Amino acid sequence: MPLAFTNPGTPLKRTAAYDNVQWNQNRILTFGTRYTVLIIVNNYESYQNIQFGESIGAVALDQRTGFLAIAHGQVLDIYKPADSLKWTHHYNYITQLSEDITQLSWGYNFDLLLCASSYTKLINFSEDKPRLVWSQNRISDSFLSSTISSDACFIASIETKNPLAKVWQRTSPQGTVSSCDDFSYLVHPCRVRFSQWSKHLHPDASGSTPFLSTVGYDNVLRIWQVGSRFGSQLMHLSCFLNLRKYYKSDQPPYCCFIDKDDFTIALAHAISRHSGQVHKDRILNRLLALASGQPHIFLLFTFECLYIFSLVIDQETLSSFELINQVPTNFPKGALQPDGFIPIYRTSKHEFYDYNIILFFQNSAREYMFSLTDFFYSDFELRVSYDFYGHDYPIKSLTRTSNGHGIVSRDVNRICMFQSYISQDGKNQLICRFRLLLGESDFILPLYAGEYAAVLNLNSLKLWHCNEAIPPTLLCTCRQVPTSPIITFFILPVQNNDNSALCALTEGGHAWFWSVSNEAHDGSAVLRFIDRVNFTKNLNIASAVDVMGWSSTLNLSSLSSFDQEVFQSISKDGLLQTWMARVLGDDKAEISEISKVQTSIKSATMIKGSTSKKVAVVSENNRRLSIFDTRSSEFSEKEEFSSVFDDYGPINDLDWTSTPNSHSILAVGFLHDVILLCQNRRSYMNDIPCWSRIRRYNLLEYTNSLISDSSWLDNGTLVTAIGNGLFYFDNSLPEDQSLLFPASLKRSAKNIFDLAYQLNGILPVFHPQLLQQLLLRNQPFLFTNILLRFYLCLKDDVDMHFLLNMDCSEFYCCDEEISKDLLIKSLSQNSAEILNPAELDFEETSVSKHLGLYIDEMIKKLTALLKVKKVKTLTRSSQFLLLNLIEAFNKARALRDSLDLNGKRYCIMLNQYVLSKHQRQLTSLPTREMAWAFHSSNKAVLLDHTKKLHGKPLLWNAVEEYAIPFWLNEQLLKDVFLELSRNHYAEIDDRNPENVSLYHIALHKINVFRDLWRLASWHKESARTVKLLSNDFSKKKWKVVASKNAFALLSKHRYFYASAFFLLADSCYDAAKVCIRNLKSISLAIAMTRVYEGDDGPTLKRLINEYVLPLAVSQNDRWLTNWSFTILKQEKKALQSLVSPIRSLVSDNDFIQLYTSDKNDQEIHENKDSQRNSTNEPVRNKFPSDDPAFILLYECLRSSNVQIDESLEYRFVLHNANVYCQLGCDLIALGLLRNWKFQKNPATAHLETEDYMVTDKQSAVEKTHDSPKLGKTLMGQDIRPTPDDVPEFNESAFSFE
């Protein structure tokens, strides 16, 4: 997304504020606006904008060194070039005089000539302290200009009313000391308008003797050469040209010189562009003949014709002008009279045209281009290449048109400028349509395509007709306006070509509505007040939803069916609300609350919402940005992103845009940077953030001004207001370090819209995330069929369509027999590709008879191919996960006859966990996988499979890692404890019984434990412990002794042993508390309690109520909550925990608050550490707790005995379909919606669709009857149809590893 173009402001209409040089093989152009200086290198190859606090007086570039001198007021600043063609500040010089510097001119060895009205000075800046070389004060008239020649030997000055131009000669201009004692007068018959030294391409080369050109008020061009032919003058009049002969006006002429060397190079470039034979081209031959005499070219423009003269400077003979040609031209009529020679410079060799000239107009300066060959065509055409215009004062705000085709910018001096976006000659730029002077408290809103503007203040609402051909015209005024301060002013989202509705929000929580009617289409319009509505009493700030995206995400029928968010507000205490606003009639409007979120953000300073129902909120200190999903329901978290931006300074701007595929991108503006945030596809397989920073603009590369506002155009161009200029960044992606994510530069995404689709779009069916969901949904035959097609495409290097040419109906087919038949059919058609019949040891080769064999062989070949061949459209990480998933599936197939559905799910997810835990740095099996095993009836098989995957003797760390205490039944858990006691005892050489104490005592094997201590005779505690364990601990006396020993062990930090002695004292709860508080293992507490007391014991229930449930609530862990209620035999709550807010199911809020506060304190501590180490990662970078597997478990557990509210189940299904879409599995979402079977059909009243049910990718429901015919525009823009084809998915170079 590089810089496309800029509007720097209106250039100063003085040639002294403009300069260009050819330096270091680069063409450098610089000019000043009122408060800024622009530096443009090689036609915007590099661009820089430097802002000052005072008006710019003059600029000058040193052709030898590239140094830039800038005069503003009585201050002179010098900038030096850096390696990256940027200029850095080098020196600051104050003249100590009251007059402003009006002209600058560089000499040799950092000599700089300063000119003001009463003096001219030559100062040397080669040393640390400036040194005055020479100065001259005015005698009579003020200095008009003072310039130094290209060889630095002569200084020429002209005065305002003096017909004498004065020339000083410098002695030893290249030395450290020089004087200008020798001078001469150049006599003119009238006052001199302007003068110019010849600018040579190589000023220090031999033969580049300078000459001086002057134009007097008699419009005669005079050429003055060095030396005297008739006396002792320093210069003499070599020749002259009477311009009045060609230019019939007393006004200053439009003329310029082209240096002879520069002309030769430009001609060489013109010849290099010629595709045919040069000697056959008549025009090129004429130019070659002209260049052979090494002339300077003089161009004289009139409004009808261009005159081309040649001037040969010769020291031996008299010089003369020769008219080469005159050609009709289209010289612009509105160009202002020049105060010097027209600025002209050669273009780079890669451009089609040879030269550019700059002409000044009333509110702009335009760059025109032409070719040398145009000199001899029948018509000379000046083509506009750039229009320099803009604000003279810093821009305060930007307001976008509703269709995104233009913006209105407003500066601090209340000048408002409307600019519309156009594409001309392959270049994109904004054209200024009108300017309007506003009041101090006015709000402006462009209407339709920008040809109308509404201006609102506390006195009136005015409607202006704004056309670029005529000045803005006031059409009508409405006096019914708010009396309290206005917060925001916006247009309602639905309008047609003739009517629109306006809305203003005030600090009192009121909304004012007006209508604008333009049915006559004759430039007239009617403005009418509609209604005032009170929508809230607790209002801090409010803003309209960013309209970029309405045209691509909604159509009019959807707006008639659903309530669309129009604006959002937030209170002082952090209550975020979104509102729908609409006009019901001629005098009636309505505002309804759509959603509300209680945030923890107090006194927010900024909010901005998108059409995809995302709202960005900035904290009170302008450092923290949070993004909320207002569409989120009770099933998910609402805060998706929160990050502190300390490195970039305070946040001062937010702006949303929507891609053609309805993905949101947020531009966050800081002092000198703009960060683009894009939402990520939810990931089931990688820990990636919900939102990622995909692009950073460091505006310090271009300017030292501060960012004031930014706005998106509809084509993805980001317009940023900085100082008095506008910067336009197109939607392309540069291959540089400014691309923050993905980090790889080699990618298929060409612009930010493509990148947003890669991060959010539909996944191909062979992506491991989609395949994993198919397995979880028990669609193994469809899974295998996809693998087969994928294998055939990969083997033959066939381009892979994202559906692999499969029928969509296969994905929502709920009959596994049909899926099996389709798989058999595909295998039969490609059986020779998979299995050679000659290799079989049986005669029957039917696929249906040996389906397992064919599948095994296909998987074997696909796995081998994936290990050696790169899949073009997958990342290395995704390809690894695909291999992982295939291997997990293959292992689960071996157990398919021994497992139920949940057992298969556990095996698949366990295999994936084991294969990827080191890469993902996982330390424990997620509670989701624990739930699959817990609800399986084949726990013995699962335990055996887990041990095999672990591949080592089972120790406690492994038991805790795989959450075995939670999902094994009581008897199997006792067997595991017995195995742990053996393995831990044999683990170390000394065989210390203390290491297995808890296991034996939990198993009530005190005698075995005593025998182990008897064998440990080497231990100093052996005898005493054996004696102690020989007592009867069923008696109260010995329970007290065991308890005292437990406390003694606690004081010595021997926690494991202490827990065993609490258990020996029959204090199971105390033993569990030691495990939780001291050993930090709630798993050990649960396991020990279940083994010691059984699942029906009181301690387990107490632990669940006091520790497990509060922990689950604090972490929003529905899986753990479901497990807890199932153990507690509360079946209804267990089922509700999958669909209802967890807090509503837990009554003991004291423990919840305890865990929540502890968690928040820990997060704050971790966040501070992470910010101290790196500020490049968001504070909250995990996905919300939405998981489509909830509905899979819900489907397994629901029964006729436990009834769930029908409307709640309905919303739950829709929510999970939305989550599937966010995972990129839209086809699975469709299958869920098509195949879901309600136990009882929901009532019609419960089928009303709510906003949060609508997904980004859900098609709008078209009304088939009783629907009025609506227009085809939205926000004044034609509604675009849904794309016919989906962009190809390619994540091949994303750095997701």
UniProtKB/Swiss-Prot annotation:
GO annotation, cellular component aspect: cytoplasm; cytosol; endosome membrane; nucleus; RAVE complex
Keyword Coiled coil included in the entry's annotation: no
Phenotype caused by lack of the gene: Leads to sensitivity to a range of drugs including doxorubicin, camptothecin, cycloheximide, and bleomycine, hydroxyurea, and fluconazole.
The keyword Magnesium is annotated on this UniProt entry: no
Pfam families on file: Rav1p_C (PF12234)
Functional summary from the UniProt entry: Component of the RAVE complex which is required for stable assembly of the vacuolar ATPase complex V-ATPase.
Annotated protein name in UniProt: Regulator of V-ATPase in vacuolar membrane protein 1
